[in-house]
Design a protein with these regions (language model features):
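All-alpha amphipathic helical-bundle segments outside canonical DNA-binding/catalytic cores
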Residues: 73-85
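Short, surface-exposed helix-loop/turn micro-motifs enriched in polar/charged residues
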Residues: 17, 27, 52-55, 75-78
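Active-site acidic catalytic loop and adjacent metal/ATP-binding pocket
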Residues: 1-33, 37-39
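Regulatory N- and C-terminal appendages and interdomain linkers associated
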Residues: 99-134
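Active-site activation/catalytic loop segments of kinase-like enzymes and analogous catalytic loops
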Residues: 32-71, 85-103
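Short, conserved loop/turn and helix-capping segments at secondary-structure boundaries
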Residues: 29, 33, 57, 107, ...
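Short amphipathic alpha-helical segments and their helix-coil junctions
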Residues: 17-21, 59-74, 119-120
Length: 134
């Protein structure tokens, strides 16, 4: 799946999601992996510098706590999940780099995406280290 804020349709007047888009490739797996992919959006340019309180958006930690309260799960070490998601994105961008190299990339921004492989890999390793990897 591709569960993130820009793949959601929100109700026009109520604080609720009406639809989730881009789930044609969804799989069964650890639900926290998908949820933490959503949580990563808090660190991306769209939300990173926004006044979340003024927008009535919970902080990253608050959102994790709400999700875990609703699902009955304990809040895990999110660093492992962020590392996993960043590593997965690095793999995707490496695939894009291969298509750029082979001349089969369809997206006009493919080269820009491919350039993210190393920074995503480094960020993944940093989160893994925060979670205890050596």
């Amino acid at each position: 799946g591709d569960y993130r804020l820009d793949n959601m349709i929100f109700h026009a007047t109520e604080p609720r999601v009406q639809a989730v888009l881009d789930w044609e490739l969804s799989t069964l797996g650890d639900p926290m992996a998908d949820f933490t992919y959503l949580l990563m959006q808090w660190t991306m340019p769209g939300l990173a510098n926004a006044d979340l309180k003024a927008l009535n958006i919970p902080s990253q930690d608050e959102a994790a706590q709400i999700y875990c309260n609703v699902t009955g799960m304990a809040v895990p070490d999110l660093n492992w999940y962020f590392s996993y998601n960043l590593f997965r994105l690095a793999g995707i961008t490496q695939g894009i780099a291969g298509r750029v190299r082979d001349g089969t990339a369809a997206n006009a921004k493919a080269l820009e995406s491919a350039a993210r492989t190393v920074p995503l890999s480094k960020a993944s390793w940093e989160y893994a280290q925060k979670a205890g990897a050596t």
